[in-house]
Amino acid sequence: MTDRADADRPATSPTGLRLYDTMTGAVRDFVPLRDGHVSIYLCGATVQGLPHIGHVRSGVAFDVLRRWLTAKGLDVAFIRNVTDIDDKILNKAADAGRPWWEWAATYERAFSAAYDALGVLPPSAEPRATGHITQMVELIERLIDRGHAYTGDGDVYFNVATLPDYGKLSGHRIDDVHQGEGVATGKRDQRDFTLWKGAKPGEPSWPTPWGRGRPGWHTECVAMCEAYLGAEFDIHAGGMDLVFPHHENEIAQAEAAGDGFARFWLHNGWVTMGGEKMSKSLGNVLSIPAVLQRVRAAELRYYLGSAHYRSMLEFSETALQDAVKAYAGVEDFLHRVRTRVGTVVPGDWTPKFAAALDDDLSVPIALAEVHAARAVGNRALDSGDHETAMTQARSIRAMMGILGCDPLDERWESRDETSAALAAIDVLVRWALDSRAEARNRKDWATADQIRDRLKEAGIEVTDTADGPQWSLLDGDSKDV
């Protein structure tokens, strides 16, 4: 998916890969910092609730990038963080009457289950924000020492005016910056952003030279990038909603601290419904367990990965079912070849498939190659040309493997992936219902109703029976607790 005429020329990078860099606004040759090695940092989840399909799109999109780089023989270090301390986590845990750390750990497991259900490879490391407080404090101290940060009323702020080129990633003019943090009495300038929040009653806090408190959102990723990938690395990735303020503020801190930081910035588009970003606040989310009641995990993965990663993916039931049919066509062909010809081992992808992925991960074009091979293979199989059919089947396995949804891969064939995902969700629902039962026992009806309503938003219906609560996915299977 090229954006400029010169992007159509053959790749000249040693990897053969060209990627769209948000910083430059162009498709550029990807040349790793270290020959044969690629370092990637993906902004992961803020673990405040059950994951919906909008949350996991970045995981699927950049899993394809990782698989393609690995297939090219590169050693990939892939880091995906977990934000386990945040205002929303603290507020939701308090509303439910649960410890904040337990709340975060529970939904971290929910995200892990969702990624696993969709065949996303586990990261090389998955650091939690709370495990890197020391590194954050050290980073903030460096920023204060260099004159880029200051303390105020127990908080610590980054002084945006000290960086003349602030806003270069997002295109924001420094005079027009609005951080969306609200009014803070300790700020010298409302354009500044928070690095550290002073301690508040009832909230977790850690000791620092400027008093107890907890980290701001933008600091954790810079500290963890440094800890796992060094002062300079190849690719920083995330959803396009993170360009500003999160990634802009990461760049500000890293450069102010003297780091080279990321050499490429990659951002995936949203999953939308009715033209709006999928968001709990808008009430237009589709939880992973709810969708997996209607389609298999491999089919959902195919659907989420079928659009170009930078494009918006407008969800519709028709589009989802079209993806199911397309995936079934590939699956049926491979099964036919295996039944009539023999074992199908992955072969070689086609040159057009490779060219598509080398052109900024143009998955729609790559999938067109898959279906072209399927059409050739089906005709060959029907005419008795088993050799051609097998060649096409082996090529399809190679291509679908890069896309993470090879129908003959053992992860899809050796288990009922939907049942596995539902089993993971069952653990989480039981935890929520235990919290609801505790609230009911202390006659806290508002909290009990809130937990039930949140489950319903995630596509989970709770029914109170004489034998205890029973939960079910809306229009799906039910389970006793």
Swiss-Prot record:
Taxonomic source organism: Mycobacterium sp. (strain JLS)
Membrane-crossing segments per the record: none
UniProt keyword Ligase present: yes
Motif position, 'KMSKS' region: 277-281
SMART domains linked to this entry: DALR_2
Keywords: Aminoacyl-tRNA synthetase, ATP-binding, Cytoplasm, Ligase, Metal-binding, Nucleotide-binding, Protein biosynthesis, Zinc
UniProt GO MF annotations: ATP binding; cysteine-tRNA ligase activity; zinc ion binding
Subunit description: Monomer.
Lineage: Bacteria, Bacillati, Actinomycetota, Actinomycetes, Mycobacteriales
Ligand binding (Zn(2+)): 43, 221, 246, 250
Broadest EC class assigned to this enzyme: ligase
Catalytic activity annotation: tRNA(Cys) + L-cysteine + ATP = L-cysteinyl-tRNA(Cys) + AMP + diphosphate
Name of this chain's protein: Cysteine--tRNA ligase
Pfam families in the cross-refs: CysS_C, tRNA-synt_1e
Gene: cysS
PANTHER family: CYSTEINE--TRNA LIGASE, CYSTEINYL-TRNA SYNTHETASE
UniProt key word Thylakoid: no
Signal sequence interval, chain numbering: none
Domain of life: Bacteria
Cofactor: how and how many bound: Binds 1 zinc ion per subunit.
Cofactor(s) it depends on: Zn(2+)
EC number: 6.1.1.16
